[in-house]
Amino acid sequence: MTINITKTKERPVFPFTAIVGQEEMKLALTLNVIDPKIGGVIIMGDRGTGKSTTIRAITDILPEIPIVENDPFNSHPQDFDLMSDEVRSRIEKGESIPSVMKKVSMIDLPLGATEDRVCGTIDIEKALTEGVKAFEPGLLAKANRGILYVDEVNLLDDHLVDILLDSAASGWNTVEREGISIRHPARFVLVGSGNPEEGELRPQLLDRFGMHSEIRTVRDPELRVKIVEQRSEFDKNPSACLETYKNQQTEFKQRIIQAQKVLPTVELDYDLRIRISKICGELDVDGLRGDIVTNRAAKAHAAFNGKQTVTVDDIKAVITMCLRHRLRKDPLETIDSGSKVQKVFEDIFADLM
């Protein structure tokens, strides 16, 4: 008996530009895609508000990237900071490196994942008997130059969250076993989502996420009806729905590509940087991550809107998401919705508004 296996097409993804009512979450994801050094985003909100749908939708819209063919780490064919040691040594020997274009990958990290599954494993027996570094790549290798998504991140083991955040911040994953060490690039946008009713992350871990997006269930009945209709249309005929939003998707993709190009040249005036740091000081934010992330996010926002210089509007659009999860609070309090940050912002920027 012969079984014919046909290659199935990729499952259609709900178009990013069709998602309505969750603008803060969409903006946070977009800015992290433009500048991954912002440090990722944690999205907390009610069940059934489209968190997972939106995250998968942003991945589908991203431009393709060049990678070294058959490389498990998605190494860049030219950029030494984004390639594995093996590819680098091949280039230094003068070998020809074939490359292909590939869609940006989105890797799901399951809650039950072990450290070996996340980081990868070294075959100690092979290393000792044959003298070669036999490495089985983990999820961090697959996520290099892509998006790593952790649903219900607040339920993930703290030790694993630490590993993810360390790799996201340094851009490298190092695996050490029995005196053998292997490292590979792990530059990814870390996106976590969860329901605050199921528990919050520790403040030390929360602070490591660049941005915090808070989403609530849409209450406006007309908007709710619109969302339900859109979803029903997509489920009934995905290809027709995708065709409807094709031009908007293409335009959005071009805006991201252009923003990534101009980002290095975007300027943020010294006076505005001083005011951002004043806000962080007034809010009693620990450390300097708040200042750094706000500066980066404001520049990314300016680039996304085609500007060469950051304005007050750019800072206003991002500062709440950059700081709300860094405020000191009592253990029984929930994370501030943003009213404290906005009040201090308005006080310090009053003369420029």
Curated annotation (Swiss-Prot):
ATP binds at residues 45-52. One of its GO terms (cellular component) is chloroplast. It is found in: Plastid, Chloroplast. This is Magnesium-chelatase subunit ChlI. GO terms for biological process: chlorophyll biosynthetic process; photosynthesis. The gene is chlI. It comes from Guillardia theta. Its EC number is 6.6.1.1. It catalyses: protoporphyrin IX + Mg(2+) + ATP + H2O = Mg-protoporphyrin IX + ADP + phosphate + 3 H(+). GO terms for molecular function: ATP binding; ATP hydrolysis activity; magnesium chelatase activity. Belongs to the Mg-chelatase subunits D/I family. InterPro entries: AAA+_ATPase, CHLI-like, ChlI/MoxR_AAA_lid, Mg_chelatase_ATPase-isu, Mg_chelatse_chII-like_cat_dom, P-loop_NTPase. Keywords: ATP-binding, Chlorophyll biosynthesis, Chloroplast, Ligase, Nucleotide-binding, Photosynthesis, Plastid. Pfam families: AAA_lid_2 (PF17863), Mg_chelatase (PF01078). Involved in chlorophyll biosynthesis; introduces a magnesium ion into protoporphyrin IX to yield Mg-protoporphyrin IX. Pathway: Porphyrin-containing compound metabolism; chlorophyll biosynthesis.
